[in-house]
């Protein structure tokens, strides 16, 4: 009778501990209909989630619940049931929490079986190296004397069961950071230690498992401990970011070249260096000899994945690849404005007229005499525009072959292409046929793929008429190509157009900035939406007393089709002056790079970018070639991980600022100049 009471008490203790741990899995689980109100409205019901996943907003819910929400809002933007953020997507499954749920269920089912044999010590073994389930098997003793000694030591049966439970969840915690750890069947439980010693041993074993993380499934295992070091929005890409609060071993322990290990090491270096310390790289694509004058390029661009960059002159263009190991550039393709292309200028191929897709019958005289002025580079295409109202599209996977030419009836003032190479946007200034009055127009050119040949196709463009006669000065597509930002030249207006329904573009935000309109003023020079967070936007300008601004666009708060949002200012960056040509937003959304007229490159970093009074830092990173006009200025680009800043100026000099190269005390790491700290 007494043994039955002990058994019942042990099972009660185990069940209580399991319930406490399982409470962490109490998350949004499913949709249920509310019949009490008389309507078929559904609401989210919480429960124990066994298919836990994380959304792009950072909240954790059930994967089946998210699929139900997507079916409920098929024609609308799916909102997070926890934070109510709209247009969220499923980022990844949280494998450790799913394994924990399965192991809790398994341990509940095997608790009664493990209690039946009181004369044998239960040992936890792994059934197979690839299986994540755990089983309890009796560990055989070689002598009865050993069993008697063990039974004397385990006079308190509660200690025995709790030591087994601690060991079980020690393995679960270690499995989160070490999937290849093998726990053999000859690993008996420590039975003669006190509870404090067991907890101390468990902490030591857990900390040691953090030192050498080895992951067996690199394709599916996604670390979600530190998706971003900012509270604005998580990083939306395929690169895993490791937590920076773990102990990182020396470089000698990273000989396996594991991608996750390297990412963890870089994250540790980045956390210690950014934004004050970096490794500086500099390369000249066209070196000078004997003091000759350096070659100047009209425009340049860096691809969104930071694997290529392009340089153009009036009649030539060049594309370079970036070596991921040493960041050195190498020429991969080049060509001329006449249509010739090839791997180098000594092996150019004539463009055949039959393979060229065009939307208008341009004269041969126009094509031969035109000069290039603007260029943009995506991951797949290089687009170039210039005089004679010509826009060319080159396929960089075919040595820069010209695949599309568009000849507009009006001058093309600015161009852009989204990172996924699906939309080209450019601004033109049209004229009314009857009155001759100028009109600002935005043209959207879609790029589709043939379902059979997978060749790019260019359907008829979509023209958007702006409600202003002021010419368009800048145009910029958002990272996900759902929004288009543009600014005007004379009245310094800036607008946001929604492209979520590409055939029905809609103006969702408009405002004007009161700045100087003298001859030296260039007005608004750049407008950038934050990646993954369209509520934040950075605006730069070159005019008297017009410092860069970070504004709240409020476009996710508008209701109704005809509603237009009115933005509000969040941060005014006065410390870097008022002659800023360009800006670039870090994918981490906690830093902005600025380029002024003199060629100085600054980085302003702040935790949230939501308050002008919050702590922020501004540092001088680099000095590149100056530019009197904004279209001649250098190009800035953060890599997808946000730990490198790439800079390409009009002299063809390529700079790389690597903030994750090493620790600040390393010889190759240099310190930046801090100009502002708040």
UniProtKB/Swiss-Prot annotation:
Annotated GO CC locations: plasma membrane
Region: Disordered, residue numbers: 111-158, 179-211
Basic and acidic residues bias spans: 149-158
Comp. bias regions, Low complexity: 127-144
Description of post-translational modifications: Hyperphosphorylated in response to extracellular amino acids and dependent on the amino acid sensor component SSY1. Phosphorylation is positively regulated by casein kinases YCK1 and YCK2, and negatively regulated by phosphatase PP2A regulatory subunit RTS1.
Keywords: Cell membrane, Membrane
Polar residues biased stretches: 179-194
Top-rank taxon: Eukaryota
Name under which the protein is recorded: SPS-sensor component PTR3
Signal sequence residues: none
GO BP annotations, alphabetical order: response to amino acid
Subunit structure: Homodimer. Component of the plasma membrane SPS (SSY1-PTR3-SSY5) amino acid sensor complex. Interacts directly with SSY1 and SSY5.
Function, as annotated: Component of the SPS-sensor system, which regulates the expression of several amino acid-metabolizing enzymes and amino acid- and peptide-permeases in response to extracellular amino acid levels by controlling the activity of two transcription factors, STP1 and STP2.
Species for this entry: Saccharomyces cerevisiae (strain ATCC 204508 / S288c) (Baker's yeast)
Membrane topology recorded in Swiss-Prot or TrEMBL: Peripheral membrane protein
Effect of residue 525 to A/D/E: Loss of function. Abolishes hyperphosphorylation of PTR3 and, consequently, results in a failure to activate STP1
Subcellular location: Cell membrane
SUPFAM superfamilies from the UniProt entry: Tricorn protease domain 2 (SSF69322)
């Amino acid at each position: 009778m007494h043994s039955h009471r002990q058994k019942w008490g042990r099972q009660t203790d185990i069940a209580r501990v399991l319930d406490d741990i399982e409470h962490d899995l109490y998350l949004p689980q499913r949709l249920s209909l509310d019949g009490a109100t008389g309507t078929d409205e559904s609401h989210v019901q919480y429960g124990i989630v066994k298919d836990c996943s994380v959304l792009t907003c950072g909240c954790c819910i059930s994967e089946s619940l998210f699929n139900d929400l997507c079916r409920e809002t098929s024609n609308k933007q799916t909102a997070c049931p926890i934070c109510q953020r709209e247009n969220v997507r499923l980022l990844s499954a949280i494998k450790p929490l799913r394994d924990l749920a399965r192991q809790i269920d398994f341990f509940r089912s095997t608790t009664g079986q493990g209690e039946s044999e009181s004369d044998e010590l239960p040992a936890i073994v792994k059934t197979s190296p690839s299986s994540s389930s755990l089983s309890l098997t009796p560990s055989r003793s070689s002598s009865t004397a050993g069993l008697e000694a063990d039974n004397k030591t385990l006079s308190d049966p509660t200690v025995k069961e709790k030591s087994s439970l601690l060991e079980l969840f020690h393995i679960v915690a270690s499995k989160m950071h070490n999937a290849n750890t093998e726990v053999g069947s000859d690993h008996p439980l420590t039975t003669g230690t006190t509870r404090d010693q067991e907890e101390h041993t468990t902490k030591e074993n857990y900390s040691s498992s953090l030192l050498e993380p080895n992951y067996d499934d690199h394709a599916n295992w996604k670390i979600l401990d530190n998706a971003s070091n900012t509270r604005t929005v998580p990083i939306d890409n395929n690169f895993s970011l490791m937590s920076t609060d773990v102990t990182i071993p020396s470089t000698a322990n990273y000989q396996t070249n594991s991608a996750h290990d390297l990412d963890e090491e870089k994250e540790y270096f980045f956390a210690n260096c950014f934004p004050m310390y970096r490794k500086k790289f500099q390369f000249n694509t066209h070196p000078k000899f004997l003091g000759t004058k350096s070659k100047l390029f009209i425009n340049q661009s860096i691809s969104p994945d930071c694997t290529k960059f392009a340089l153009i002159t009036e009649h030539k263009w060049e594309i370079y690849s970036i070596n991921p190991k040493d960041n050195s550039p190498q020429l991969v393709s080049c060509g001329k404005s006449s249509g010739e292309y090839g791997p180098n200028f000594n092996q150019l191929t004539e463009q055949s007229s039959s393979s060229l897709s065009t939307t208008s019958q341009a004269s041969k005289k126009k094509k031969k005499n035109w000069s290039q002025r603007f260029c943009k580079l995506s991951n797949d295409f290089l687009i170039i525009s210039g005089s004679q109202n010509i826009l060319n599209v080159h396929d960089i996977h075919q040595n820069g072959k010209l695949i599309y030419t568009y000849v507009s009836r009006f001058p093309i003032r600015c161009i852009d292409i989204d990172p996924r190479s699906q939309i080209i946007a450019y601004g033109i200034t049209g004229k009314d046929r009857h009155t001759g009055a100028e009109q600002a127009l935005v043209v959207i050119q879609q790029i589709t793929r043939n379902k059979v040949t997978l060749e790019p196709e260019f359907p008829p463009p979509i023209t958007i008429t702006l409600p202003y006669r002021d010419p368009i000065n800048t145009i910029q597509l958002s990272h996900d190509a759902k929004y288009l930002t543009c600014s005007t030249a004379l009245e310094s207006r800036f607008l946001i157009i929604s492209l979520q329904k590409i055939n029905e573009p809609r103006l969702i935000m408009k405002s004007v900035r009161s700045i100087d309109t003298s001859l030296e003023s260039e007005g608004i020079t750049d407008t950038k939406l934050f990646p993954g967070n369209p509520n934040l936007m950075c605006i730069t300008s070159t005019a008297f007393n017009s410092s860069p601004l970070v504004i709240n666009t409020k476009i996710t708060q508008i209701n109704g089709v005809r509603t237009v949002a009115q933005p509000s200012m969040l941060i005014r960056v006065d410390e870097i002056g008022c002659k800023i040509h360009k800006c670039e937003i870090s994918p981490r959304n906690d830093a902005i790079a600025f380029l002024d007229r003199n060629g100085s490159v600054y980085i302003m970093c702040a935790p949230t970018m939501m308050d002008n009074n919050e702590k922020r830092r501004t540092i001088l990173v680099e000095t590149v070639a100056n530019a009197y006009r904004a279209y001649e200025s250098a190009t800035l680009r953060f890599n997808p991980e946000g730990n490198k800043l790439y800079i390409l100026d009009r002299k063809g000099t390529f700079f790389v600022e690597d903030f994750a190269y090493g620790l600040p005390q390393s010889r190759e790491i240099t310190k930046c100049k801090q100009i502002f700290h708040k």
